[in-house]
């Protein structure tokens, strides 16, 4: 709450005192609930010093303090208006009584609003001392108020008057807090410190609650809400895990090749199961692993070659599969584009036809007022269909359904009137041939565009089909080449094996011939006695027998060579 003090007259009337101002303020503004609970203006005013009174807790209320209008400076004899003359008797006996005005307050917290005054009032100590207000800035609490209360109001009035007259700039304002106000007015708080945020006591007369207590409650509620939000924040951060959906595999997609060990496992699993039918999968896998480790590199290479060939075939099939997917996607996108273009053309034609229909009907008006005289059952019996327009826009077709129970004398004039309106509209369409030609041109352009789009789509489809055929041909050629290579490799291996077998046979024959020659040489080197005895005949007789196998062996060699030649010839014919 901002309390404003207005300047008094320059002459400082003697009749103005602190009690009069408080009496006027309590009587006029607060009624029964007085601001300072002052007594009435009579001789019992000083009895208030012996009584205790409570200051109400001022909430957000706003009080209007009327300005104190001073008399003009030209008339010094008039110190105060006539309305304040009866109260001058209260200020006269103050010095004669000798009693001190010591208001007492119960030990309670006060929620008094700050009063805004000029800042230079606090800084200029000389002005305050000259006006009679003695301020001790070192002490913030004063026990008793020992001066004349009239001097306080006079000093305050002089301070505001000095601010208005230009001694102090009015723009510099400061705020006096509660402790400074209590120190200046001499409020004896009984040793209780004034707290700005303490709630009002329950004995306070004001019905409104203290704003400080409500602020504290709101702060507590906000703190509790913040704690609750912090507790619920980690719970809300945890989101349930959504199960990942497995993608459905396309049955047309080629399968990935199997490793060499998997091929070996397939080959050996059946044999192991046959030998050990009660063996588990783990035992079988252990046996297969040991067998795989015991295999040589050549046998492993056989399975590795098979896997490499399967990988090559898989890559080729995968390329073909992806090409087919691309072609399908392109075809679907082309179909979607054609559908969209057709829909757009249809929508544009519908819009143009509806616009032309509306313009023709607005130019020639609606059905004349003669059908309005028909009875209420007429709209139910006659239901005109909407006007249908064709593309050339040369004629407008209308159809009217007439109920069986409708009298003929009512239907005839209605049909005749509608016919006249339709004829008028037809003539109007004939009158504007330029519009028809423009529409016809637009339709022709749209048809041409559609035809071009269709042709482009067909060309794209043909190109895609050709690409697909080319890919298939390439795949077939590659497969045929691969098959031929495998066949050639097999034939080469067979030819090599045959050559090796022939070489082995030739080596065996050569060894056999060498042995025979050695034996023959040994027999010739032995000395034979020249005796015509049966022993010599027996000894000499085996020589031709031993030498006789030579022509047989010579005959056997050409037979073997002829056989090898016959085996090589069919192989050459295959190549």
From Swiss-Prot:
GO BP terms in the entry: apoptotic process; negative regulation of neuron apoptotic process; positive regulation of transcription by RNA polymerase II; regulation of apoptotic process
Annotated DNA-binding residue span(s): 254-322
Composition skew (Polar residues), residue ranges: 527-541
Keywords: Activator, Apoptosis, DNA-binding, Nucleus, Transcription, Transcription regulation
UniProt-listed SMART domains: HMG
Biased composition (Basic residues): 239-249
Gene3D superfamilies: High mobility group box domain
Keyword DNA-binding appears in the UniProt entry: yes
Subcellular location: Nucleus
Pfam families per UniProt: HMG_box
Bias (Basic and acidic residues) ranges: 222-238
MF-aspect GO terms: chromatin binding; DNA binding; phosphoprotein binding; protein homodimerization activity; transcription coactivator activity
Region (Disordered): 189-258, 516-575
Subunit structure: Homodimer. Interacts (via HGM box) with CITED1 (via C-terminus); the interaction increases estrogen-response element (ERE)-dependent transcription and protection against cell death. Interacts with CREB1 (phosphorylated form). Interacts with CREB1; the interaction is not depolarization dependent. Interacts with CREBBP (via C-terminus).
Name of the protein this chain belongs to: TOX high mobility group box family member 3
Lineage: Eukaryota, Metazoa, Chordata, Craniata, Vertebrata
Name of the coding gene: Tox3
